[in-house]
Amino acid sequence: MVLSSSCTTVPHLSSLAVVQLGPWSSRIKKKTDAVAVPAAAGRWRARARAQDTSESAAVAKGSSLTPIVRTDAESRRTRWPTDDDDAEPLVDEIRAMLTSMSDGDISVSAYDTAWVGLVPRLDGGEGPQFPAAVRWIRNNQLPDGSWGDAALFSAYDRLINTLACVVTLTRWSLEPEMRGRGLSFLGRNMWKLATEDEESMPIGFELAFPSLIELAKSLGVHDFPYDHQALQAIYSSREIKVKRIPKEVMHTVPTSILHSLEGMPGLDWARLLKLQSSDGSFLFSPAATAYALMNTGDDRCFSYIDRTVKKFNGGVPNVYPVDLFEHIWAVDRLERLGISRYFQKEIEQCMDYVNRHWTEDGICWARNSDVKEVDDTAMAFRLLRLHGYSVSPDVFKNFEKDGEFFAFVGQSNQAVTGMYNLNRASQISFPGEDVLHRAGPFSYEFLRRKQAEGALRDKWIISKDLPGEVVYTLDFPWYGNLPRVEARDYLEQYGGGDDVWIGKTLYRMPLVNNDVYLELARMDFNHCQALHQLEWQGLKKWYTENRLMDFGVAQEDALRAYFLAAASVYEPCRAAERLAWARAAILANAVSTHLRNSPSFRERLEHSLRCRPSEETDGSWFNSSSGSDAVLVKAVLRLTDSLAREAQPIHGGDPEDIHKLLRSAWAEWVREKADAADSVCNGSSAVEQEGSRMVHDKQTCLLLARMIEISAGRAAGEAASEDGDRRIIQLTGSICDSLKQKMLVSQDPEKNEEMMSHVDDELKLRIREFVQYLLRLGEKKTGSSETRQTFLSIVKSCYYAAHCPPHVVDRHISRVIFEPVSAAK
């Protein structure tokens, strides 16, 4: 089961100036606007403002009640959001990216290319075996004399790339001027090693850089600062690391050390060749494999290098392939940016690919690896489980030792991103999955400790706002994460093409981090937001016309109710579901209050709900009364009538049947609310009331689910066909009741910590069971995934509301509903 919307219409978006200069990695976009607000979105915002200013006048004139969605005529005029071609090129381009995935699109590493260029002809002749690699070096020196990532300066990266290229050119007595400029750069910048952040040190730098220095010295490279003070710390680190390398182990079983063999002395190649990866590489490292080829002449090493050189037109990346890494991380980015609905087929293909290469021991960045690591394993586990694949959490036992979790099998260190993705994986645990129940607290405490230390940096990536990503996930776990809140934050955390990964050198993954995803996501968000603003204007009119302020529902309550709906069901094509949720939630709050205050109200409302749509106006009371009972009864009946009219074209059949579904849902809710021992609101403080209006009880949550489902053309809860479906409905109600109870307990100073802990434990168990039923039914492909998504959205919104302080909710409302996303990166 894919827990995402099937709504895939392409939005009407503003034009984007794009220049295509070759492959994805060289895509350049022209940015001219300060704020990425589509022209159409701007028009809708202007219209929303105009509607807002004329609202009171319209009400004064006795205008007809606001419809649940726009009329057919209005929809034809606006054609929201399907008929503009501006988004099509972006969607098509991303689709082409996703379908082009193979072994991974990755930038070239000058360091690794230099090692490949050092391989002499294997037939004993003079010159390099791979002259194309040497050509690449000659063609890619930067203006300052260095080699490396041109857009981001890192002393580690530039120094190791530059020294490697100088060594290779010296080995073949080529380009003395280039070598001189490279050596000049090294001399000018060596001091910067002492100022670099250790977290950004490339993989194996303390081993590889001294090895290159020794190689340079053996080749007679002059003018290199061999005794520079900044090198002393690197030499010391090398001695410590060399002593720690388990030489016997590294020759016996595959370990991550295989990735960094180049320049390492005292290797037993006969034994190491038995540890080659299936593609002939040494843990997918061109540099390590080139070094092995120099020392062994192995045919499989040659084949791997030869294929890679040809693939990248002379250069080679720092690691290859990166197929699993690319497939997994691209899906994650698209989902968090809120644009995955456009690419459901392509995402399904990506996840099928990952599932084919999943193993019970885990995975790493490339298929068929004998070495596994927790970062890719955790990301793949989470996505596979969420997309309906059966995966066992026992895989994480491979990364656990003495109650701690680590990055690679056999190691004992952690990285921020590895623990971050482990924590995300633990959030979708099932009952009894003890390893995930241990991984969750361990990773949470590790990350919170790093946060307190101001150390949420990672050795694998230099991203725009990794601390923001981590803190958001810790504050809003998966079962309390509203999609549009996440997308709004991630749009400011995702750096697009500016995000850089750290391997042996800096590298880029253009199908994971690129500006095309970012541009479409910004446009989509702003476009949906403009529609949401227009809907809110209509909802305010409806709120005023029905006098809901007279029943204790403030306009702020109405806005919060709409926000929960819009942040959960945000797609333009799901306006009917979104507005049904919001209006039902607002009206339910008003009715709940009036049921307690008016003894006669229940009987009158139930009587009216039992009548046929044409009968309720026959009674003299209904026609003549303008009291509070009549006002609220009319509001409920008008809502059910509006929902029925909008849902009839979707359902088909007899409109009377839809009315019956809607009215019976409300009648059942009224009966249960009136009969329940409702101690929640009695004696509540103002603060408690504010929260209680957002956190619904079981009866109201199930009412909202039925309103959403009927508006979507389904009828959740009327006749659940599977035991699992029925259990999901039961658990939804139970979780919502527990959340309501938790909120009230937390606000009562007389309640003790033991009671709060008991409520938390019960809630945790119910959520795990809910997640299990939800995702296991997805694995079986039974029932309606859309209906399960409805219940998930209801649970998430209640969890969010119960745990999120009011001032944070209000900030999210502002960002999600009212503040457009800026184009500034």
Curated annotation (Swiss-Prot):
Keywords: Chloroplast, Isomerase, Magnesium, Metal-binding, Plant defense, Plastid, Transit peptide. It catalyses: (2E,6E,10E)-geranylgeranyl diphosphate = ent-copalyl diphosphate. Pathway: Plant hormone biosynthesis; gibberellin biosynthesis. Induction: Induced by the fungal pathogens Fusarium graminearum and Fusarium verticillioides. GO terms for cellular component: chloroplast. It is found in: Plastid, Chloroplast. Its cofactor is Mg(2+). A motif (DXDD motif) lies at residues 373-376. GO terms for biological process: defense response; diterpene phytoalexin biosynthetic process; diterpenoid biosynthetic process; gibberellin biosynthetic process. Its EC number is 5.5.1.13. The keyword Plastid applies. The keyword Plastid applies. One of its GO terms (molecular function) is ent-copalyl diphosphate synthase activity. Residues 1-70 form a transit peptide. It is an enzyme of class 5 (isomerase). Substrate binds at residues 241, 459. Expressed in tassels. Belongs to the terpene synthase family. Tpsc subfamily. The Asp-Xaa-Asp-Asp (DXDD) motif is important for the catalytic activity through binding to Mg(2+). Involved in gibberellin biosynthesis. Catalyzes the conversion of geranylgeranyl diphosphate to the gibberellin precursor ent-copalyl diphosphate (ent-CPP). Involved in the production of antifungal dolabralexin phytoalexins in response to biotic and abiotic stresses. In response to fungal infection and in associtation with KSL4, is involved in the production dolabradiene, a type of antifungal phytoalexin. This is Ent-copalyl diphosphate synthase 2, chloroplastic. It comes from Zea mays (Maize). The gene is CPPS2.
